[in-house]
Protein backbone atom coordinates (compact mmCIF):
# COMPACT_ATOMS: atom_id res chain seq x y z
CA UNK A 1 0.00 0.00 0.00
CA UNK A 2 2.78 2.41 0.92
CA UNK A 3 4.59 1.64 -2.33
CA UNK A 4 1.39 2.19 -4.30
CA UNK A 5 0.76 5.52 -2.54
CA UNK A 6 4.32 6.63 -3.19
CA UNK A 7 4.05 5.71 -6.87
CA UNK A 8 0.75 7.56 -7.15
CA UNK A 9 2.28 10.63 -5.51
CA UNK A 10 5.26 10.45 -7.85
CA UNK A 11 2.99 10.20 -10.88
CA UNK A 12 0.84 13.10 -9.68
CA UNK A 13 3.94 15.25 -9.17
CA UNK A 14 5.13 14.40 -12.68
CA UNK A 15 1.73 15.27 -14.12
CA UNK A 16 1.72 18.62 -12.32
CA UNK A 17 5.23 19.28 -13.58
CA UNK A 18 4.25 18.51 -17.13
CA UNK A 19 1.30 20.88 -16.96
CA UNK A 20 3.46 23.59 -15.37
CA UNK A 21 6.08 23.26 -18.09
CA UNK A 22 3.47 23.44 -20.81
CA UNK A 23 1.90 26.54 -19.24
CA UNK A 24 5.29 28.22 -18.76
CA UNK A 25 6.32 27.55 -22.37
CA UNK A 26 3.00 28.88 -23.70
CA UNK A 27 3.11 32.04 -21.57
CA UNK A 28 6.74 32.67 -22.49
CA UNK A 29 5.98 32.36 -26.19
CA UNK A 30 2.93 34.62 -26.00
CA UNK A 31 4.49 37.47 -24.02
CA UNK A 32 7.77 37.23 -25.93
CA UNK A 33 5.98 37.74 -29.23
CA UNK A 34 3.81 40.46 -27.65
CA UNK A 35 6.87 42.38 -26.46
CA UNK A 36 8.50 42.15 -29.89
CA UNK A 37 5.34 43.46 -31.55
CA UNK A 38 4.76 46.30 -29.06
CA UNK A 39 8.44 47.22 -29.08
CA UNK A 40 8.43 47.66 -32.85
CA UNK A 41 5.14 49.54 -32.80
CA UNK A 42 6.12 51.94 -30.03
CA UNK A 43 9.57 52.69 -31.45
CA UNK A 44 8.19 53.16 -34.95
CA UNK A 45 5.67 55.71 -33.65
CA UNK A 46 8.13 57.50 -31.37
CA UNK A 47 10.81 57.71 -34.07
CA UNK A 48 8.35 59.52 -36.33
CA UNK A 49 9.64 62.74 -34.72
CA UNK A 50 12.12 64.77 -36.82
CA UNK A 51 15.74 63.84 -36.28
CA UNK A 52 19.07 65.65 -36.38
CA UNK A 53 18.99 66.20 -40.14
CA UNK A 54 15.59 67.94 -40.15
CA UNK A 55 15.45 71.62 -41.04
CA UNK A 56 14.12 74.23 -38.64
CA UNK A 57 11.00 74.64 -40.80
CA UNK A 58 10.34 70.88 -40.78
CA UNK A 59 10.68 70.72 -37.00
CA UNK A 60 8.42 73.72 -36.45
CA UNK A 61 5.75 72.41 -38.81
CA UNK A 62 5.85 68.93 -37.29
CA UNK A 63 5.40 69.98 -33.69
CA UNK A 64 2.84 72.63 -34.63
CA UNK A 65 0.59 69.82 -35.89
CA UNK A 66 -1.48 68.21 -33.12
CA UNK A 67 -1.90 65.01 -35.14
CA UNK A 68 1.87 64.66 -35.60
CA UNK A 69 2.53 65.16 -31.90
CA UNK A 70 -0.09 62.58 -31.00
CA UNK A 71 1.56 59.96 -33.19
CA UNK A 72 4.62 60.25 -30.95
CA UNK A 73 2.49 60.28 -27.80
CA UNK A 74 0.68 57.10 -28.84
CA UNK A 75 4.10 55.46 -29.12
CA UNK A 76 4.93 56.79 -25.66
CA UNK A 77 1.77 55.23 -24.20
CA UNK A 78 2.42 51.89 -25.94
CA UNK A 79 5.96 51.73 -24.56
CA UNK A 80 5.08 50.71 -20.95
CA UNK A 81 3.00 47.80 -22.22
CA UNK A 82 6.01 46.58 -24.20
CA UNK A 83 8.02 46.75 -21.00
CA UNK A 84 5.38 44.90 -18.97
CA UNK A 85 5.27 42.15 -21.61
CA UNK A 86 9.06 41.78 -21.41
CA UNK A 87 8.98 41.51 -17.61
CA UNK A 88 6.44 38.70 -17.94
CA UNK A 89 8.59 37.14 -20.66
CA UNK A 90 11.74 37.07 -18.53
CA UNK A 91 9.96 35.60 -15.51
CA UNK A 92 8.09 32.97 -17.55
CA UNK A 93 11.25 32.05 -19.48
CA UNK A 94 13.16 31.50 -16.25
CA UNK A 95 10.31 29.37 -14.88
CA UNK A 96 10.39 27.23 -18.02
CA UNK A 97 14.19 26.89 -17.87
CA UNK A 98 14.14 25.94 -14.18
CA UNK A 99 11.41 23.36 -14.71
CA UNK A 100 13.00 21.85 -17.80
CA UNK A 101 16.44 21.02 -16.47
CA UNK A 102 18.60 20.70 -13.38
CA UNK A 103 21.74 21.61 -15.36
CA UNK A 104 21.42 25.36 -14.97
CA UNK A 105 24.30 27.74 -14.27
CA UNK A 106 23.60 30.27 -11.51
CA UNK A 107 26.02 32.72 -13.15
CA UNK A 108 24.30 32.53 -16.53
CA UNK A 109 20.88 32.69 -14.93
CA UNK A 110 21.71 35.86 -12.99
CA UNK A 111 23.35 37.47 -16.01
CA UNK A 112 20.23 36.72 -18.03
CA UNK A 113 17.99 38.39 -15.43
CA UNK A 114 20.20 41.46 -14.96
CA UNK A 115 20.81 42.06 -18.68
CA UNK A 116 17.08 41.73 -19.42
CA UNK A 117 16.24 44.20 -16.66
CA UNK A 118 18.79 46.77 -17.81
CA UNK A 119 17.70 46.35 -21.44
CA UNK A 120 14.08 47.24 -20.72
CA UNK A 121 15.09 50.14 -18.44
CA UNK A 122 17.24 51.61 -21.23
CA UNK A 123 14.42 51.09 -23.72
CA UNK A 124 12.18 53.20 -21.47
CA UNK A 125 14.81 55.94 -21.33
CA UNK A 126 15.28 55.89 -25.11
CA UNK A 127 11.58 56.06 -25.95
CA UNK A 128 10.84 58.71 -23.31
CA UNK A 129 13.73 60.88 -24.52
CA UNK A 130 12.55 60.71 -28.11
CA UNK A 131 9.02 61.80 -27.15
CA UNK A 132 9.77 64.46 -24.52
CA UNK A 133 9.49 67.39 -26.95
CA UNK A 134 6.09 66.30 -28.26
CA UNK A 135 4.86 65.71 -24.69
CA UNK A 136 6.07 69.09 -23.42
CA UNK A 137 4.36 70.97 -26.26
CA UNK A 138 1.16 68.93 -26.04
CA UNK A 139 0.69 69.26 -22.29
CA UNK A 140 2.30 72.60 -21.46
CA UNK A 141 1.80 74.68 -24.62
CA UNK A 142 5.53 75.27 -24.81
CA UNK A 143 7.31 76.68 -27.82
CA UNK A 144 9.47 74.61 -30.13
CA UNK A 145 13.21 75.05 -29.74
CA UNK A 146 14.68 73.49 -32.91
CA UNK A 147 18.03 72.76 -31.26
CA UNK A 148 16.40 70.94 -28.35
CA UNK A 149 13.97 69.17 -30.68
CA UNK A 150 16.95 67.74 -32.58
CA UNK A 151 18.92 66.72 -29.50
CA UNK A 152 16.33 64.62 -27.67
CA UNK A 153 15.59 62.16 -30.52
CA UNK A 154 19.33 61.77 -31.12
CA UNK A 155 19.86 61.08 -27.42
CA UNK A 156 17.04 58.53 -27.44
CA UNK A 157 18.44 56.72 -30.48
CA UNK A 158 21.91 56.68 -28.92
CA UNK A 159 20.61 55.11 -25.72
CA UNK A 160 18.74 52.44 -27.69
CA UNK A 161 21.37 51.57 -30.29
CA UNK A 162 24.52 51.93 -28.19
CA UNK A 163 23.38 50.80 -24.74
CA UNK A 164 20.04 48.94 -24.81
CA UNK A 165 20.97 46.62 -27.66
CA UNK A 166 24.27 45.74 -25.94
CA UNK A 167 22.22 44.54 -22.98
CA UNK A 168 19.92 42.71 -25.40
CA UNK A 169 23.05 41.01 -26.77
CA UNK A 170 23.93 39.79 -23.28
CA UNK A 171 20.38 38.49 -22.86
CA UNK A 172 20.64 36.58 -26.16
CA UNK A 173 24.06 35.17 -25.20
CA UNK A 174 22.92 33.92 -21.79
CA UNK A 175 19.62 32.49 -23.06
CA UNK A 176 21.47 30.65 -25.83
CA UNK A 177 24.10 29.37 -23.39
CA UNK A 178 21.47 28.09 -20.95
CA UNK A 179 19.51 26.43 -23.74
CA UNK A 180 22.60 24.82 -25.27
CA UNK A 181 24.10 23.61 -21.99
CA UNK A 182 20.84 22.09 -20.78
CA UNK A 183 19.69 20.79 -24.17
CA UNK A 184 16.33 22.58 -23.95
CA UNK A 185 16.73 24.59 -27.16
CA UNK A 186 17.67 23.31 -30.64
CA UNK A 187 21.40 23.49 -31.24
CA UNK A 188 20.95 25.47 -34.47
CA UNK A 189 18.96 28.12 -32.60
CA UNK A 190 21.40 28.28 -29.69
CA UNK A 191 24.44 28.66 -31.97
CA UNK A 192 22.52 31.12 -34.12
CA UNK A 193 21.80 33.06 -30.94
CA UNK A 194 25.53 33.49 -30.38
CA UNK A 195 25.80 35.05 -33.85
CA UNK A 196 22.81 37.34 -33.19
CA UNK A 197 24.29 38.36 -29.84
CA UNK A 198 27.69 39.09 -31.41
CA UNK A 199 26.03 41.18 -34.11
CA UNK A 200 24.07 43.20 -31.53
CA UNK A 201 27.16 43.62 -29.38
CA UNK A 202 29.64 44.66 -32.06
CA UNK A 203 27.56 46.49 -34.64
CA UNK A 204 27.86 50.27 -34.82
CA UNK A 205 24.80 50.73 -37.04
CA UNK A 206 22.20 53.43 -36.44
CA UNK A 207 20.04 52.28 -39.36
CA UNK A 208 16.35 51.75 -38.62
CA UNK A 209 16.46 48.12 -39.80
CA UNK A 210 18.85 47.33 -36.94
CA UNK A 211 15.91 47.69 -34.54
CA UNK A 212 14.39 44.54 -36.10
CA UNK A 213 17.19 42.16 -35.06
CA UNK A 214 16.31 41.53 -31.41
CA UNK A 215 12.50 41.39 -31.96
CA UNK A 216 12.98 38.89 -34.80
CA UNK A 217 15.08 36.70 -32.51
CA UNK A 218 12.26 36.88 -29.95
CA UNK A 219 9.68 35.90 -32.57
CA UNK A 220 11.71 32.81 -33.52
CA UNK A 221 12.20 31.86 -29.86
CA UNK A 222 8.47 32.27 -29.24
CA UNK A 223 7.64 30.03 -32.21
CA UNK A 224 10.01 27.35 -30.90
CA UNK A 225 8.47 27.52 -27.44
CA UNK A 226 4.97 27.16 -28.86
CA UNK A 227 6.16 24.03 -30.65
CA UNK A 228 7.66 22.77 -27.39
CA UNK A 229 4.42 23.51 -25.52
CA UNK A 230 2.42 21.43 -27.99
CA UNK A 231 4.82 18.50 -27.62
CA UNK A 232 4.90 18.41 -23.81
CA UNK A 233 2.48 15.81 -22.50
CA UNK A 234 0.27 17.43 -19.83
CA UNK A 235 0.09 14.00 -18.18
CA UNK A 236 3.83 13.53 -18.11
CA UNK A 237 4.70 10.30 -16.29
CA UNK A 238 8.39 10.82 -15.69
CA UNK A 239 9.65 10.39 -12.09
CA UNK A 240 10.68 13.73 -10.64
CA UNK A 241 14.17 12.65 -9.59
CA UNK A 242 15.04 11.71 -13.19
CA UNK A 243 14.81 15.29 -14.39
CA UNK A 244 13.13 16.45 -17.55
CA UNK A 245 14.42 17.53 -20.93
CA UNK A 246 11.87 18.55 -23.53
CA UNK A 247 13.56 16.35 -26.12
CA UNK A 248 13.13 13.16 -24.05
CA UNK A 249 10.76 10.66 -25.63
CA UNK A 250 8.51 10.01 -22.57
CA UNK A 251 7.68 13.70 -22.36
CA UNK A 252 6.95 14.30 -26.00
CA UNK A 253 4.01 13.43 -28.18
CA UNK A 254 5.01 11.89 -31.47
CA UNK A 255 3.35 12.64 -34.78
What positions do the PLM features span?
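Hydrophobic, aromatic-enriched alpha-helical segments typical of multi-pass transmembrane helices
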Residues: 2-255
